């Protein structure tokens, strides 16, 4: 199936926002991408001139069926939550509530090999600009790390960033750096990633180096039955730009399993670090994971053979 790229120009609040899609995406995906650009939630968007057979296009209609002209300009009306005084605020952990896929192997497989989503990955490879902070090192494996709730409790109040840092963070990164090049990938803006890395002392630590940061714009949106549209972190973006890394030598940590949908075998769901003030004294997750990373780096030549859901039970003699 040939997948064609489509650009829709959304006109809203006096500005224009280009939205990159494929012709196999649906109106629901379009709304999700508009939300990423404008922060106007899909249910609040009124797409004035998006028609299908003379009527307002339903969410399940494919972009290809709309027969849009190149650089079609879409008129939108809608308000952000911040602009609606009586709007109910969303729960802080709404993402974590709805996005676990613990029993979703078939769904993962269908997403991973979808031509539509692979085309989106290729677009990220083409358009995303990586700012390299440290060069890759020969013979090293790749560790990709989330930030929020993985390395850092970003919701609890504190005087300093170190109060919210997951215990043993610097020891973990120092140990991992012996065998892995390290990449930070967060579903936030680059400005916030850089600020958090500065606050945590990661950016300035002499014992290890982060190769580069990836932000939310390197992610892609996928449609999952019964879940709707979600954003995921496709490792193919990194693998295409750095050929020495692939599924055999890459592992990614995140507290949200849906981020692994494009690369389910490469992801390890870490226990989220919340309520830092209560859990700082007992959280040893990073210490245990340091041991796991070291063992698989030294004893497992192909990470595809691993089941990261059972990482706590890995024994080199039995698994290598």
Swiss-Prot record:
A cellular-component GO term for this protein: nucleus
Alphabetical keyword list: Hydrolase, Magnesium, Metal-binding, Nucleus, Protein phosphatase
Location of the FCP1 homology domain: 136-296
InterPro entries membership: FCP1_dom, HAD-like_sf, HAD-SF_hydro_IIID, HAD_sf, Ubiquitin-like_dom, Ubiquitin-like_domsf, UBLCP1
Cell location: Nucleus
Residues where Mg(2+) binds: 146, 148, 255
Reactions that this protein is recorded to catalyse: O-phospho-L-seryl-[protein] + H2O = L-seryl-[protein] + phosphate; O-phospho-L-threonyl-[protein] + H2O = L-threonyl-[protein] + phosphate
Start and end residues of each Ubiquitin-like domain: 6-77
GO biological process, one term: regulation of proteasome assembly
EC number: 3.1.3.16
Cofactors: Mg(2+)
EC category name: hydrolase
Molecular-function GO terms, alphabetical: metal ion binding; protein serine/threonine phosphatase activity
Entry-linked Gene3D superfamilies: HAD superfamily/HAD-like, Phosphatidylinositol 3-kinase Catalytic Subunit, Chain A, domain 1
Role description: Dephosphorylates 26S nuclear proteasomes, thereby decreasing their proteolytic activity. Recruited to the 19S regulatory particle of the 26S proteasome where it dephosphorylates 19S component Rpt1 which impairs Rpt1 ATPase activity and disrupts 26S proteasome assembly.
Protein's name in the database: Ubiquitin-like domain-containing CTD phosphatase 1
Encoding gene (name): Ublcp1
